[in-house]
Every structure is written in C-alpha cells, then in structure tokens.
Amino acid sequence: MSYLDSIGAVIAVHPVKPSALPKGVNREIPIPAMEFFMDTTRTFTNMVMNDIFSRFPNIKWIFPHAGAFLSILSDRMSGFSMQFRDSLSTKAPFDFKGDMRHVYFDAAGFAAEKQLKNLLGDVNSENIVYGSDAPYTPDPACIAQTGALENIDYMDETDKENMFTLNAVRLVPRLGEILNIKTLGSTVCYSENELSAKDKANRNFRKMVSKVYNAVFTVKNKKDRKEIEKKVYALK
C-alpha cells in the first residue's frame, strides 16, 4: 500500500460475488442488485475505520455505483463516528464525509434519477466519473444509462463536463496527452488540433472520451489495450 501511495496509483474498487451468503436468503434476487451495494458500503466503511484514506492520501480511489448506500448512511455514520474509536484512543473521530470527498465515485448502475443526486449532497462533481459497467452490462442498457446521465437536470454543463471528461483526464493524465486535452480548473483547453465548433457543441468529443476511458479500464489484456491506444491516436 505504501508503494501504491508513493506512485499516486489509481485503484478502482468493485464488488464480486460475496464469499458467503446465508442459505436461502435473497435466493431469487440477483447478487449485483443488492449484495454489491452492501459490500461496497461495508468496504468503504472499513477503510474509514482503518484510516486508509488519511494514511495513504496520494492513492486515487474509485468506488462504483455512485457510492452504493454511502450517501444514504453518511449522516448516520458521521453520528456514530465517536463510537468507532476505542474509548482510550487519542485519535480524532472518523471523518466519514471528509473521506467521501477524498475519493471518486463512478456513475454506473441506474444512478441518474435519485442516487447520484443524493451523493452530490456529500461530494461535488469533481468526485464523479462516468461509468457503465461494460462489458457486463449489455450495450443497450449502457446506452440508456448514459443518456439518462446526459439529461440530468440537477447537474449543469460544468458538472457534466467534470463527470464525463475532466475527472477522467485528472485521474489518467495519459488520456489528456493522447487526446490533446489539458485541464485548468473546471475548463477544458483544446490544442491546435482541436475539434470543430460543431463537434464541441454537440458533445461528441465528451462522449468519445468517456467510452475510451471506460474501455481502457475494462480491458485486462495488455495487447488489447495497445490496440485501443492506437485507435485513439488515429482519432487525432
């Protein structure tokens, strides 16, 4: 962990099938529908209780599905923060919401209507990155969920630019180098090779960056990643 902190690693956290499930409980409910949220919430809370975010402040963490139940439980967990410490501890109470602001959350998994709005009560748009859960989520569902995120009425264009493009470049600066994007605060500065005004107006560029970012994070084979990078370079 110390080494990952020293290089400012980007770590994406995602649940898998739980190692144990009570027999006969939730038998007819798909595991991703509910258990993934339980595990994500529990994992983040355990990391808070072990001071992971303060001990390793340079690691960039990404938690999935708009933080699962974190935004629902944040007030409650903050209220219990004193009880998480040993009675003899000289350390300050846990800062649950502060730790939420230290990480990134992807917007995958039907988050647009309610969940992301709740999360934005604890963090801001610079903590949100686009996510689709591809390739495990079928393409039609990915497209529908992306459209829902594009049409959110409680996020302005600056917020959406952060979610779809700028935060990805901040997390993976190599993307900015490949695509000729530089981030200055909450604005995008295009190079001399910039896209036409029409392309910028209809946000095709933003959508393309989102797809590339998601593809890079879901491809494990290095050879395939190289092929993706070649295609990205060709876009210039």
Predicted stretch roles:
Residues 1-129, 189, 194-207, 213-216:
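Catalytic pocket-lining loop regions of alpha/beta-barrel enzymes
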